């Protein structure tokens, strides 16, 4: 943050287990500009603000803890490691572990795991409970939560959202996603944020009909295939760069309980040039309608598009824990760079 070294307590504003005015009218009003956007060196996308349920399975199983701190049972395995094989047999979920261990006659097994893109083998002792055998590790193979889709890119035919990584709530590690899906809500509920507690979005989602899927999970969000009709109700908007961002008035987009996309006024109060941070844009909610509705920025709003001077410039990522009216966002350029994984 320019000229300041302030230590603040922050919360990533997406939930993992792990609204008033409609769009402002200053959009690109037709597709003619989109046809010429390459020649004009401009990029156009559909800003969304669509709240979605998120479910994903991990690549292998994630180690989130130990039954006991005993080197015999954990070896060199660390929290946040991804187990991908036992005795050279590939595993994809927790059930695979149980099935493999049923056929093991030895007291030890070889665990193959990945850590920081490296493949590592560790031999550990099994725990025995009568005839049952199991690892002395706590593991997870799936996550679920709520987040917001930032935009749909018609050139790349992908969505991008959340603005920060989906992380494991126990290890705080970025999750390696094998397959993820997004779902539209059947019902949305709000737990309002206060200075004493962070609010959050929750609800029921239509899990029978995913509106998109993804495999890419990066420090700057997720990206994948998008099947929702939501983009048809919006218009193309120019993507702004860091140099287009100014201090002062802007607004964010977010769905309300009736699935209408609504704009809410904010102020941009500071801008950082740290390219590795997800706290590049400091924002403050000034719209009484949003403050009365949610208390300000709450979990599940991560990914809400930030718009200024008719350009999509960023996405909301964090809330300040003891002041829900204030938070942070990321430059939209960081999300544009995300590549989809087939």
Language model feature labels by segment:
Residues 74-95, 307-309, 313-318:
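Conserved PDZ fold ligand-binding element
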Residues 1-45, 52, 149, 327, ...:
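Gram-positive cell-envelope targeting signals
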Residues 71-82, 103-105, 296-300, 305:
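A short glycine-leucine-enriched loop at secondary-structure breakpoints
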Residues 59, 79-80, 246, 302, ...:
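Short, flexible surface segments
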Residues 31-37, 42, 98-137, 267:
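PDZ-domain C-terminal substructure recognizer with occasional recognition of PDZ-binding tails
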Residues 85-118, 323-334:
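PDZ domains, with a preference for the canonical peptide-binding region formed by the helix
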Residues 48-78:
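PDZ/PDZ-like groove recognition
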Residues 128-295, 299, 308-309, 317, ...:
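Serine endopeptidase catalytic core focused on the charge-relay Asp
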């Amino acid at each position: 943050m320019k000229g300041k070294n302030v230590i603040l307590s922050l919360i990533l504003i997406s939930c993992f287990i792990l609204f008033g005015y409609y769009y402002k009218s200053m959009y690109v009003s037709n597709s003619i500009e989109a046809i010429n956007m390459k020649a004009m060196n401009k990029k156009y996308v559909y800003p969304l603000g669509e709240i979605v349920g998120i479910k994903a399975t991990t690549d292998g199983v994630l180690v989130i803890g130990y039954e006991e701190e005993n080197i015999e049972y954990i070896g060199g395995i660390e929290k946040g490691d991804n187990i991908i094989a036992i005795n050279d047999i590939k595993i994809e979920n927790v059930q695979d572990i149980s099935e493999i261990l049923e056929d093991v006659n030895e007291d030890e097994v070889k665990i193959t795991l990945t850590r920081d893109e490296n493949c590592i083998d560790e031999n550990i002792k099994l725990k025995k409970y009568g005839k049952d055998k199991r690892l002395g590790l706590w593991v997870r193979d799936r996550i679920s939560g709520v987040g917001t889709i930032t935009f749909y890119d018609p050139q790349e035919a992908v969505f991008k959202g959340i603005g920060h990584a989906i992380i494991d709530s126990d290890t705080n590690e970025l999750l390696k996603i094998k397959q993820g899906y997004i779902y539209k809500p059947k019902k949305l509920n709000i737990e309002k944020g206060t200075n004493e507690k962070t609010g959050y979005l929750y609800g029921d989602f239509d899990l029978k009909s995913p509106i998109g899927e993804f495999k890419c999970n990066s420090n700057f969000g997720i990206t994948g295939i998008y099947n929702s009709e939501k983009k048809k109700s919006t218009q193309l908007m120019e993507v702004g760069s860091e140099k287009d961002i100014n201090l002062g008035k802007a607004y964010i987009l977010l769905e309300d309980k009736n699935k209408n996309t609504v704009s809410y006024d904010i102020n941009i109060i500071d801008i950082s040039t740290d390219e590795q941070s997800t706290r590049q844009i400091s924002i403050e909610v000034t719209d009484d309608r949003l403050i009365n509705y949610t208390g300000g920025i709450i979990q599940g709003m991560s990914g809400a598009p930030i718009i200024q001077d008719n350009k999509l410039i960023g996405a909301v990522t964090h809330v300040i824990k003891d002041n829900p009216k204030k938070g942070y966002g990321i430059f939209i350029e960081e999300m544009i760079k995300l590549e989809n994984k087939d």
